[in-house]
Amino acid sequence: MALWGLPGSAVLAASVFVGGAVSSPLVAADNTGSHTLHSRAETTPSSPTNNPGNGHPEYIAYVLVPVFFVMGLLGVLICHLLKKKGYRCTTEAEQEVEEEKVEKIELNDSINENSDTVGQIVQYIMKNEANADILKAMVADNSVGDIESPVTPSTPGSPPVSPGPLSPGATPGKHVCGHHLHTVGGVVERDVCQRCRHKRWHFIKPTNKTKEGRPRRQGEVTVLSVGRFRVTKVEHKSNQKERRSLMSVSGIESVNGDVPATPVKRERSDTE
């Protein structure tokens, strides 16, 4: 009843205040709901179809293999063009490494097939040239200093043993075979040595340790050198022929030992 006595402005203000208090929780609830929806949307993982950054790693191989293939063909093409222009592309270090690998493989095969440990020791000792030279010098000194020292076919300076007809009571001579190394205590009077009888020892291949470098051609100039890769240029034969012709002409003019005359000297001689 007291409300009817209040002025109209007071009633209007009270109604607005009550309406705002009632509507404010609803707005807050809507805001929190919107925040929760946004947070859920942010926390959900993105699908691989929506994210353009996720790529398949197996497809990278299909791209890299053609790229490397094209690069190799491009290098071969460049070397071919340089060869046509007079250059030459070489990789000398790789050839030396391949030769060393082949020698190591052959040596390992011969050692594995050999079952005599003493023979392996002798082979390792004789592999060094200095040891071989010292051993030969020692054998030569012993054979010269000691008159009664027996002369074996392996000693330097000994005459070759020629097999001759055996007498009825004579013992067979010592077997001489230069295909493999003899161990200590091998001075046994047998016609065939133990190694040749079992046929376990292969022929020794002489190892060429001193490798001569590749002879450089006349007029060859190194243009580019990157590691093992080298590009060299050889002068054309026409330039060499011109030089030879000039040298021959100058040689004909100086047959009597006189120096070939220069154009200035020729003009002076003509004026005189």
UniProtKB/Swiss-Prot annotation:
GO-annotated cellular components: microtubule cytoskeleton; plasma membrane
Positions of modified residues (Phosphoserine): S110, S115, S245, S248
Stretches of the chain found on the membrane's Extracellular side: 24-58
Any one of the GO BP annotations: positive regulation of p38MAPK cascade
Membrane topology (Cytoplasmic): 80-272
Compositional bias per record (Pro residues), positions renumbered to this chain: 156-166
Stretches the record annotates as Disordered: 33-52, 146-171, 235-272
Pfam families: RELT
Disulfide bonds: none
Keywords in alphabetical order: Cell membrane, Coiled coil, Membrane, Phosphoprotein, Signal, Transmembrane, Transmembrane helix
Signal peptide: 1-23
UniProt feature, compositional bias: Basic and acidic residues: 235-245
Transmembrane segments: 59-79
Membrane topology: Single-pass type I membrane protein
Subcellular location: Cell membrane
InterPro entries in the cross-refs: RELL1, TNF_rcpt_RELT
Keyword Zinc: no
Coiled-coil regions listed in the entry: 90-114
Subunit note: Interacts with RELT, RELL2, OXSR1 and PLSCR1.
Role noted for this protein: Induces activation of MAPK14/p38 cascade, when overexpressed. Induces apoptosis, when overexpressed.
UniProt family annotation: Belongs to the RELT family.
PANTHER family: RELT-LIKE PROTEIN 1, RELT-LIKE PROTEIN 1-RELATED
Name of this chain's protein: RELT-like protein 1
Species annotation: Mus musculus
Taxonomic classification: Eukaryota, Metazoa, Chordata, Craniata, Vertebrata
